[in-house]
Amino acid sequence: MVDTSSSALPPRDVLAGARALRAVAERYVYVSTVNAYRGWPSDPLTEASELLDGPPDADAEYGRLPEGWDGPDWYYGRQKAGAERAVLEVFGEKRSVLLRPGVILGPGEYVGRLPWWLHRAERGGRILAPGDPAKSIQPVDVRDVAVFALDQGAASVGGAYNVVAPVGRETMGSFLEACLEVTGRRGKLSWVPDAFLLEADVEQWTELPLWRTHVGVWNIDSQRARAAGLVCRPLAETVEATWRWLRDGGVPVTHSRAGEHGLDAGREQRLLAAFDGRTVSGIEG
């Protein structure tokens, strides 16, 4: 049994499904998330890192934040942590496989991170590239997650696995260069430091997808998953396959998050002009 349900299916529903399948499923593979960790994205993580709270019978309201809350948004992570506990309660440790992927990219992506960068590269011109080109990033290809999930369903010893690319193998620079390469190299990257972007109130993770300054966001140990057979293809292959999918008319499923990613073209140029003059005056919004 491989369960890819999102937080739209609360822990209590996962619990009910697990109970219904207990007698017929040998293993329960639950696709969770690194958001289930209390320390993400601030701290480096291993599978032993503390999870967020979330009871196995929680409903969809558990963990919702009050109006006006300006602290960490742990709702999604709490729902996923509760669902993990639901699976464990029914199937036990040896029959439960808990996959915790980070950012998943690849053909069919509906969140819009990689598609936005590809379309931005295709448009060409001067492209605002965020932060340090040498910064390690750890996206994983959706096809590699699928293969690992099926393999673990067939032969896992159970337990939790961080499903991300190895730390240090991929960088933000190599990722954006791959986007330029597959789209015909119409643009040129202009690297802008984190400090300037933060002072200019650029939204991390959304306005510039994959850009985030927190220490732990791309510092997730995946050695256990790789020892169990996880193979992560080079990120350049994911970029090329996603571009081919888009060029062949690929259309993602409709999702509310698809419109939240990307920097407005006018704001991008104002930011670049301001960076050239080393001032952030008048560039917010």
Regions found by a protein language model. Give the residues of each.
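Conserved sequence/active-site signature of Rossmann-fold short-chain dehydrogenase/reductase
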Residues: A36, I104-G106, G168
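Substrate-positioning beta->alpha
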Residues: V111-W117, P130-A155, G159-N162, E237
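NAD(P)H-binding glycine-rich loop region in Rossmannoid oxidoreductase-like domains
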Residues: M1-E26, Y30, A36-G39
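Mid/C-terminal beta-alpha module of Rossmann-like enzyme folds, strongest
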Residues: D151-H214, D221, W243-W245, G250-G285
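Conserved beta-loop-beta element that borders a ligand/cofactor-binding pocket
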Residues: S32, A83-G108
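Active-site helix of classical SDR
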Residues: Q79
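Active-site "gating" loop of Rossmann-like NAD(P)-dependent oxidoreductase/epimerase domains
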Residues: V34-Y75, E89-G92
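A short C-terminal helix-loop "cap" of Rossmann-like NAD(P)-dependent dehydrogenase/epimerase domains
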Residues: L118-P130, R185-R186, V217
